[in-house]
Amino acid sequence: SDSLPSFGRSGSASFVLNDRLYLVGGKHALGAATDEVWSYDAVTSAWIQEANFTFGALWRASACAYNGKGFMLFGRDENNQFQQGFYSFDPITNQWESLPSFPSLGRSHAALFALNDGVYACFGIDSLGNSHNDLWKFNEIGNEWIALPGIPALGRRGGVCLTTQESMYYTTGIDETNNRLNQAWVYSPTLGIESPSLKEPTLLEVYDILGNPVAFANNQLLFERYSNGEVKKVFVIE
């Protein structure tokens, strides 16, 4: 397949509509964000430059497709400011529409996904450096965001989000103590959210001898608390 006929970039958002891949935003090697939108036609193996994203340059946004439209949420602008905007793209009119913003701080490295019954958002890191373990659904009828029960584990960002029509699977990522994760979680509207590996307890927090939450570090005594109630003493010598 042909390479993208523009500068290289990272942190772009993407979604697929009608067998066409849409690539939105990103940041190029000089550190500036872009508002470019490209589509790739798998039939003709050709890239097509679409109209630029209406609401400015953006990178590390989250995107998905649902009911014939593309949706995009969060990201950082050209000044590296975290955004909470939510947008939809209509491939018929080739136009973007602003939808109700996310009702909290802007984020990046989050997940936006679609199931049979709508569009959902979860996790990510906000402008204060906090990682999240929450789950939200966009209510199209009420035109609002609704909070749902999140995962009973530490907040996380940058993992892999995969979906079937009925369920979302989320795995790996980095938690709020900067640990690389190998956990897997599954969510469905009928069953809620759970870990497929129920035999493996989930690490909930790490704290020091005084009970203060801390990031994991070598050469000090720490305590790990797990979802099954177990507490482990940890001392790693570097």
Q: What is each of the regions a protein language model found here?
A:
Residues 25, 74, 215-217, 235:
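Short linear motifs in exposed loops
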Residues 67, 197, 230-231:
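Generic N-terminal leader/processing signal
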Residues 221-238:
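C-terminal tail/sorting-segment detector
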